[in-house]
Each structure stands twice: as structure tokens, then as C-alpha cells.
Amino acid sequence: MSNEFINFEKISRESWKTLHQKAKALLTQEELKSITSLNDNISINDVIDIYLPLINLIQVYKIAQENLSFSKSLFLKKDIQLRPFIIGISGSVAVGKSTTSRLLQLLLSRTHPNSQVELVTTDGFLYPNQFLIEQGLLNRKGFPESYNMELLLDFLDSIKNGQTAFAPVYSHDIYDIIPNQKQSFNNPDFLIVEGINVFQNQQNNRLYMSDYFDFSIYIDADSSHIETWYIERFLSILKLAKCDPHNYYAQYAQLPRSEAIAFARNVWKTVNLENLEKFIEPTRNRAELILHKSADHKIDEIYLKK
């Protein structure tokens, strides 16, 4: 961490866990296992030490958002309109964004039982493979230019204004957008937006996705550790794909282990590492909170914007 983080308060794990009174984890070990991504590693103690204080912090921001909205309505002499509380979660491929997002969705649902808590991933806003092929962009999939940012910004604008919104659905099994399938959102109380690009906007330098966020999180780790996690995840995906000939990764499932590792390492270095270093990591200081992971996936440091 460098002067890039001069505007952040660094908090150790030991200090962070004292910011919430000891309580039950609000979920069972089985539930935690069901929402944990392939090759990610999270324990009930992590939930208690890291995520319960985080839920408290989100509540602080939510109260502040509601108070500001109320005050603005009075100032403008308009009816009070409660808007969805939008949380953006970013970080590299294979760093654990999906686990964090699903866990926050579950914990927010438990702590706000009368609230609607929804989750959307920006994968659904990738252009379909056919379009990427036609534009010569298939090998740039995941880079900023491969996303339909106009559609994504329109989606967020509809959500923020309390309108029903629809998001395309992406399947990792077929490595493409599912045709004619949409996920609908009807004015949720909380919306979690997860993706590698949630702090980026390639097409409109005057408007960022983060302009719509009420709270934002960046999952951080040393790139060498993320590379290891990426390769481990790739091998796990290949094991699952062996049983499904329709799975996109089935074409790689018969590779000898050494060749599969070499293939994954090459993809990491030529695609994911470049994307991380050029487009993802430079946006992390736009987050309100940075959760830093050590080699064993455990969050060891927290950075909160001052």
C-alpha cells in the first residue's frame, strides 16, 4: 500500500473484530459452504470477525443515506422518496468477490428481515460472444471494451430511481449470455452489484458506475496469490466439466494436469493479470472499504476511507 491510500484508515483484523459485539454468525456452517465459491476459503470465525462489523458499518452508511435523502426532499420541497441502497463490490478474477457478495446478501437479509436484498453481477452486461467475435474482441472478454456499459448504466439509473429494471443473465457453463433470459428487479431495498468493472466506465468519462453506489468494497490481494487461486479454481472447474459435455470447459477437461496448469497460467498472465494491473487495481481507491486477503484467503487488513 502506498500514498494511493493516504485517504484511508488502516485497521488490523484484531482491531476490526472489536467493532462488533460478539454474537452468533447468523448462518450455519452448511449455509456458509453453499455460498462459498470454488476454492475460496471462509469460516464462521471470518463471518463473526469481519462480516458482522461490516454489516454494522453498512447500517451506518444506510442511515446517513436516508437522512441525506430526507434533508434533500425538505430542501427541494418534494415528497420523500426512499431509494435502494446500492453496494458495489469489485476486485480481480478469482479473488473471492462472489463469496463476499452472496454472504453480504444473506447477512443483510437476516439483519433486515423485512427488506428485499438483491444481487446482480456485471457478467450479464458482457456483450454476447457472437458480437465479440464480429468485433474482433473475443480475446478481450472481461476487458472494459467487452461490456455494454450504456446498458449497465441505464440499469443502475432505473434502480436508483425506483423503477423496475432488467439485467441479462450470464452462464459460466456456456461462457456466454443466455439468450432471451432476464433477471428482474422491482425496487429492492438493497442491491449488491458485483463485478471486476464496477468502478470503471470506459465509454463515458463523465459518469462512473460508482456514482450510483451508496457503499463500495474492493477485495484486494497480492497478484501472486490470486494467480494461485485462479489456477486452483480452473482445475476444480475442469473436474466438474468432465461430467458435462455441454460445459464450455469440457474441451479442456481431458488435458493432462501439467498442461492444464500451463494453460491456466498463460491465460492468467496474458489476460487476467493485464486486466488487473491496467484496469481493475487502479480503481480500488474509489472504494469506501478495501478488504485485503493473505495467501490463505483470510482477510488480514481493512482500509476504510476517512
From Swiss-Prot:
Pathway: Cofactor biosynthesis; coenzyme A biosynthesis; CoA from (R)-pantothenate: step 1/5
Subcellular location: Cytoplasm
Catalyzed reaction equations: (R)-pantothenate + ATP = (R)-4'-phosphopantothenate + ADP + H(+)
Gene Ontology CC: one annotated term: cytoplasm
Annotated residues for binding of ATP: G91, S92, V93, A94, V95, G96, K97, S98
Disulfide bond residue pairs: none
Record's keyword terms, sorted: ATP-binding, Coenzyme A biosynthesis, Cytoplasm, Kinase, Nucleotide-binding, Transferase
GO MF annotations in UniProt: ATP binding; pantothenate kinase activity
Main location: cytoplasm
GO biological process, one term: coenzyme A biosynthetic process
InterPro entries noted in UniProt: P-loop_NTPase, PanK, PRK/URK
Nuclease keyword on record: no
Enzyme class: transferase
EC assignment: 2.7.1.33
SUPFAM superfamilies linked: P-loop containing nucleoside triphosphate hydrolases
Recorded family membership: Belongs to the prokaryotic pantothenate kinase family.
Name this protein carries in UniProt: Pantothenate kinase
Annotated source species: Streptococcus pyogenes serotype M12 (strain MGAS2096)
Gene assigned in the entry: coaA
